[in-house]
């Protein structure tokens, strides 16, 4: 059995990572989506252990101290991290493991796992991104402003990545992301 690979997927909040990954994973059940841990509150419909591992800040900080994360970062006032052991287990089983993580986490993985493929998902425009975030109706104005400011940084960092996919037309973006992950 061959060893698997790690693919890092990042992009601004609201760019459509979840929508595209759902389509990719339905077409590629052999791939494994790493479940991140976070200190943020669950959104409606999110299930602990399925969408995220929802932890208190104290629990998260204990796991940091015990080096249980492959990467971790603070984003929009919350901590996010990738539990190390499930990723290593799945790679050793020969699977493609997808990490859907923030920019700082992607940079950490680049240092710890330089062979990981790095893919950034971008919106067709900042205006389109803002509209998508507002349509969620899950954030107040201050949170939206923080996310848009962070998005500018993430868009500016696109040149750091191996592959760049623009999420403009859904079918085209799915095909491009599939190629970026599996080819």
UniProtKB/Swiss-Prot annotation:
Every Guanylate kinase-like domain range: 4-182
Catalytic activity: GMP + ATP = GDP + ADP; dZMP + ATP = dZDP + ADP
GO molecular function: ATP binding; guanylate kinase activity
Family named by the database record: Belongs to the guanylate kinase family.
The keyword NAD is assigned to this record: no
Source species of the chain: Synechococcus sp. (strain ATCC 27144 / PCC 6301 / SAUG 1402/1) (Anacystis nidulans)
Lineage: Bacteria, Bacillati, Cyanobacteriota, Cyanophyceae, Synechococcales
E.C. number: 2.7.4.8
PANTHER family reported in the protein's UniProt record: GUANYLATE KINASE (PTHR23117:SF13), GUANYLATE KINASE-RELATED (PTHR23117)
SMART domains registered for this protein in UniProt: GuKc
Keywords for the protein's UniProt record, in alphabetical order: ATP-binding, Cytoplasm, Kinase, Nucleotide-binding, Transferase
Subcellular location as annotated: Cytoplasm
Catalytic EC class: transferase
Residues noted as binding ATP in the record, renumbered to the chain: 11-18
Stated role: Essential for recycling GMP and indirectly, cGMP. (Microbial infection) Catalyzes the phosphorylation of dZMP to dZDP, when the bacterium is infected by a phage that produces the substrate for the synthesis of dZTP (2- amino-2'-deoxyadenosine 5'-triphosphate), which is then used by the phage as a DNA polymerase substrate.
Coiled coil: none
Database matches in NCBIfam families: guanyl_kin
Protein name (database record): Guanylate kinase
Annotated Pfam families: Guanylate_kin
Gene Ontology CC entries for this record: cytosol
InterPro entries, A to Z: GK/Ca_channel_bsu, Guanylate_kin-like_dom, Guanylate_kinase, Guanylate_kinase_CS, P-loop_NTPase
Chief site of localization: cytoplasm
Pathway, per record: Purine metabolism
């Amino acid at each position: 059995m061959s060893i698997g690979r790690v693919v890092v997927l990042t992009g601004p909040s609201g760019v459509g990572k979840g929508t595209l990954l759902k389509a990719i994973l339905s077409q590629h059940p052999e791939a494994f989506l790493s479940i991140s841990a976070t200190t943020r509150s669950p959104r409606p419909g999110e299930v602990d252990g399925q969408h995220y591992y929802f932890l208190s800040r104290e629990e998260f900080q204990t796991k940091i101290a015990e080096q249980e994360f492959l990467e971790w970062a603070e984003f929009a006032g919350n901590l996010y991290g990738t539990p190390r052991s499930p990723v290593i287990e799945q790679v050793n089983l020969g699977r493609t493991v997808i990490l859907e993580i923030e920019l700082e986490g992607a940079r950490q993985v680049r240092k710890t796992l330089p062979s990981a493929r790095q893919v950034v998902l971008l919106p067709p425009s900042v205006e389109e991104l803002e509209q998508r975030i507002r349509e969620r109706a899950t954030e107040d104005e201050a949170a939206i402003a923080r996310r848009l400011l962070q998005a500018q940084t993430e868009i500016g960092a696109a040149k750091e990545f191996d592959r760049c996919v623009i999420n403009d037309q859904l079918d085209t973006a799915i095909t491009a992301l599939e190629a970026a992950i599996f080819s």
